Amino acid sequence: MAFIWRRRSTTIVKLVAFALAIWFCIAFLVYTDDTRRRAAQEGAGASGAGSAPGVGGGAGGLGDPIALALRNEPAGEDFGINGNVIGGGGQKQAHDEADIPPTVGKHKADLQAERMRKKAAEQPKKKPQEDSKKVIDPPANFEENPGELGKPVRLPKEMSDEMKKAVDDGWTKNAFNQYVSDLISVHRTLPDPRDAWCKDEARYLTNLPKTDVIICFHNEAWTVLLRTVHSVLDRSPEHLIGKIILVDDYSDMPHLKRQLEDYFAAYPKVQIIRGQKREGLIRARILGANHAKSPVLTYLDSHCECTEGWLEPLLDRIARNSTTVVCPVIDVISDETLEYHYRDSGGVNVGGFDWNLQFSWHPVPERERKRHNSTAEPVYSPTMAGGLFSIDREFFDRLGTYDSGFDIWGGENLELSFKTWMCGGTLEIVPCSHVGHIFRKRSPYKWRSGVNVLKKNSVRLAEVWMDEYSQYYYHRIGNDKGDWGDVSDRRKLRNDLKCKSFKWYLDNIYPELFIPGDSVAHGEIRNLGYGGRTCLDAPAGKKHQKKAVGTYPCHRQGGNQYWMLSKAGEIRRDDSCLDYAGKDVTLFGCHGGKGNQFWTYRENTKQLHHGTSGKCLAISESKDKLLMEECSASLSRQQWTLENYDSSKL
């Protein structure tokens, strides 16, 4: 029995020991699992604080937070489009990490990291990290750093509904592809478009003046505005920049309020000026100039990118002659892909205008080319585009800055161009300076003014600066000048400065411009068939060239029905000529070689005879199409009257 008891005791001890071992294992596993679950719950609570309801860490980060980003709206009162981590991350204050891109699908679950972030926020402000790249990370299959070296960013054709909405919202609000912009670094690299001639530092003076850079904006997209400013800071010698003055023309988007101030608080050269009401570009620029202190003012639009070496060539010209106004070559940044397009100095154009007082680009005239040994040398330009230029501050003041009676924008570039040349200055385009600009096909901004702003500004311009040549603009608007306000102070300015005449300007600065007064006829071209109420009608401009010219009921208001018959037999709409090559009658750039653009008006039969084809211009029975027919003097559909026809000018 003792033996049996001893065996049972040993077995019991073993069973108890085994049971204790199992209990300890179970207790350890339960404790570990509970710890993990509690940590995960705490982490989820921390990370969920910055997430939009119902948004998880979706692939590509294309949920609501991106839609917020593309709408330029913050997730909270003081948090802008950089205030959320896309895909469900913790909030970060915009002024701490405003240019650090949200990371798709990465959760900040560590509470210690959150405490460290809050502690860091209490420390003195530091400059935002310079390796920041973009606001949103690219979708799958995108290169890591899209848009570098100015390369295009092309979105996939197949997009999720969320992504498509975000893209569409960006286009609607900005008239360019904001979604693509938000994929690209605000410090992206660009190609160097300069000729070798430009890179010789010995060409530029060493004691160049400082400039204040004035950038006016209204509801500009976050990344585009930041990229503009950083391109100035990153590619300009620090000692040549006085201040970068950001003039807010009464923006109402939240990301342009405290978020913008917090971001640029780390950059002492950047100053933000707020307009107290919507002023428009012209008066916003005047406001910026009033806050400038440096000897040179440089104006840039808020959707630009400066390239390497852009500034020194501009300042050099002003340092040599303070009455020289200089413009960089304006390269095109695609509104869709943000690709940076540029051309070498041989392809540089100069500014002009037409008698609608609209700015236009033209090749450098042969007379100007002969003045230079290199195509990279600065060239005279009759006018400037107006958005990007540098000017001596005292000379700008002497010229009366901008006409404060101009509203919003339009015409200010021609006014400054005319008075620069007529009042003792020169206007140049500098091929060694390149700045990219996003050209939009429409304006995303709305004004409540019932006034035709462009016409009002243009009439003020014509009344002050164009002398007797103003009549050619008035013909284009049917002599309906409207209310242009009081220009007596601007006329006094011109008299006080003893400026030259507009005829001097045309003869010496822009002799290439066709003068309507030299034409044989100018005004409407009316067909006498089918009631005699149909006129030749076509919009001008390069984008309308090579399209069939149409007809429209005569309205006697100029515009698309204002034509000129030159002594050379051209039927002109400014720089476009009526052209017939055997198919449709179209507008084509005037080439001066007669041929397809040579027309003769037969006054006795009232026919327009085409030189190379031998046919006559007619209209269809439906009165909506031009025809070319075998000439027959008896057909009224081939008969035309030309307004202000004067055969003595032939």
Curated annotation (Swiss-Prot):
GO molecular function, one term: polypeptide N-acetylgalactosaminyltransferase activity
Region: Catalytic subdomain B, residue numbers: 378-440
Cysteine pairings via disulfide bonds: C198-C432, C423-C499, C535-C554, C577-C590, C616-C631
EC number: 2.4.1.41
Positions on the Cytoplasmic side per record topology: 1-11
GO biological processes: protein O-linked glycosylation; sexual reproduction
Enzyme class: transferase
Residues binding Mn(2+), per UniProt: D301, H303, H437
Residues carrying sugar: N321, N373
Segments of this protein annotated with the region Disordered: 84-154
Free-text domain note: There are two conserved domains in the glycosyltransferase region: the N-terminal domain (domain A, also called GT1 motif), which is involved in manganese coordination and substrate binding and the C-terminal domain (domain B, also called Gal/GalNAc-T motif), which is involved in catalytic reaction and UDP-Gal binding.
Subunit structure: Isoform A forms homotetramer. Isoform B forms homodimer.
Protein name: Putative polypeptide N-acetylgalactosaminyltransferase 9
